[in-house]
Amino acid sequence: MTTVHDLSSDTMTTAADRAARAIPPVWPLASSVAVNPFLGQTEEHLAQVSARLGRIGNVPVTMPPAHYAALIEDGTITDDDIASASAASRIDNAPDLAEIKRSAAVPFDRPEPHSTIADLAARMSGIDWPGILADRFGHWASGFFDQGQALWAAPRRRGAYDAWRQTATHDLTPEITGLTGFAQFVSETPDTAQEARLRAAKRLGLDDDMLETYLHQLLFSLGGWAQVARYHLWQAELSQTTDETIADLLTIRLLWEEALFLQYEDRIGDRWEATKTAHAQPVTPQRGEIINAILQEAWEHAVQRDLASTIAAPSPERGEDRPTLQAAFCIDVRSEVFRRALEAVNPGIQTLGFAGFFGLTASHKSFASDVDELRLPVLLNAGVTSTSTGENVTAEQTARFKARAKRAWGRFKLAAVSSFAFVEATGPIYAGKLVRDALNIGSDPHDYGPAPVLDPPLPLDAQIDAAETILRAMSLTTDFAPLVVLAGHGANVVNNPFASGLHCGACGGYAGDVNARLLAALLNTPDVRAGLADRGIDVPSDTLFLGALHDTTTDAITLFAKDHPSAAHDAGIAQAETWFAQAGTVTRAERALRLPRADGDADVDLRSRDWAETRPEWALAGCKAFIAAPRHRTAGKSLAGRAFLHDYDWKKDSDFSVLELIMTAPVVVASWISLQYYGSTVAPDVFGSGNKLLHNVTGGIGVVEGNGGTLRAGLPWQSVHEGEGYAHDPLRLSVCIEAPREAMTDILRRHDGVRALFDNRWLHLFALDASGQMAWRYTGDLEWSEMARDARISDDLDAAG
């Protein structure tokens, strides 16, 4: 007999909200960005999260012990690394070196997750209730969340709970498979989701102590569907409102539990009571989970030692002359390779790193489109609106008519009546189109439309404020070159549902060309320059800013020179295009060494047009460090396309407002990227989106493997694995900043969320000293420890001298 507890509505609502916030959001495919899969667990350390996720889904959060054993065997991880990692864990009765090394040599038996009622019913009946539930829920959710892929839109006006009830009362599949009277059960549920949750909780005998992990488990079992709903809540809260979709999904999942319990209570009652007792116990990591977390940290210490050695190597002498060309790129790790190659082409070239949205949080309408593209970090709201309408009204109207005709034709092809006849009648006509598409004939992937403009324009004072803020954040206030290129980045691929994930994360999953062109226009405005001069930023009259786009798939640079025609700069622009082309050749050759089946730089370009290519580029695979310092600290040093590089000169940042911006925005975005790759590598079945070869796009929002079921979020397996080995080492990001420790400590003290990332080791923080070396390690609780000068670093420096 189930014990009934007096559970209040407020308690249940609070628990449901906590469960919702334990789920990370996922953005739609059209504007997908990397998301930290551990977003709801950053207040806990790795071993604790291992225990929590193990309880609800047997989710690994580190590599298996054998992985670390191999690194110990080959000398990558030293005894000192293990000892320092163990000390950093701050765990009472921490395992000693011998115990840790013994544990690395044997497999760790992870405890089984607690069972849901669906799991218990499946064991008792032999019916795959979790699978049936996933199938029926996915069938409904793909229609409810559809963003235009379906021909008929599902009703959403009254929310997810009401929409599901309307569908479930007519879906006989659960009853056919053995859940007697399910449609009738759904029809008799309370009219509001809140009442239904409370009724189900009381029938199941839930109490306060077990709600935290049990409700989290139910949402977790819905996979990407819960993450889509969490995205709706995220977007609503950015607009200072709220959204009940994820709470509705929790209610639906809880009602499935209630229905199954009513049918199988006499057979699973005792087991369910034991499960409730287990859920009520504190979440405590096992010894093996603690040791795995220490081994993970030891590996990161080893990598940090090598990073310190690279940064400590001598840098080339800096010239005092005015730069011939300045090129600002996104901090994205893919820019590191190109920047290094470009600087090697000509010593007069200076490159800079800055967030790829270039400080302009734009809601943009592309040419002949009314769709609002949020080209900004997902942590922020739009601050300006822009459009690429252009002055040619006739051309825009023609483009709109063509787009409408294309949409109508597409719907005709997919309609129930016409689809089969269409294939029979017109299939041969498409042979020519297939050939043209395969050979890239007759299309212009580089048609970026007219120059974007702010609409409405900002007042002059606001323009000057924005320009000053951005230039100071870039540490670019003096020594301007005659030509300053602002290069956003994007990707150029075909037949790839994840194309937006290859674009700029700081631009919300869009390319960064619009933001770069908007900033160039702002900085070329004479009145803005006059205002900047009054504020101590004197831009020479012969300096021209140009927007550009760095295609990270082909490493081609497109300069938008027509945005700002200048005969005086024609020769300089032509020379810059030559330098960019030379740097692109060098970059492609280096990237080809990492890409499977790529023999040289020519193969890199071909991959972008190959329909069957599952790895057109590695995107941010391999990312391991974030460095905010003057460029000369890293110039001439190969970071192998694995470091985010943000220019920052703390001596120009008197109030440390730029430092605060870096630590609370770009660093957080980089952590989302790093931890998405981490999660998709250590737990690909949970935090990854599976095999690209099996993907089907559903609803325009995400992918499923096969023809339905759970929505898959995260990175595809092909994005972290090259077929024979890992393309990404799952390492938590090492953040290296050249700034006073006191200033960083003060920022951490005022930003609890950022501090939690460092205190709980989701990120590592290092302070660079006056010589640019990694000198201090942040150890948590606003404390720092001085780093010992590693012998290998000394040897490297002596050899270099």
UniProtKB/Swiss-Prot annotation:
Domain of life according to the entry: Bacteria
Cellular component annotations (GO), alphabetically ordered: plasma membrane
Annotated compartments: Cell inner membrane
Bilayer topology annotation: Peripheral membrane protein
Assembly description: Forms a complex with DabB.
Gene: dabA
Natural source organism: Jannaschia sp. (strain CCS1)
UniProt-recorded name of the protein: Probable inorganic carbon transporter subunit DabA
Any one GO molecular function term: zinc ion binding
InterPro entries found in the cross-reference section: DabA (IPR018752)
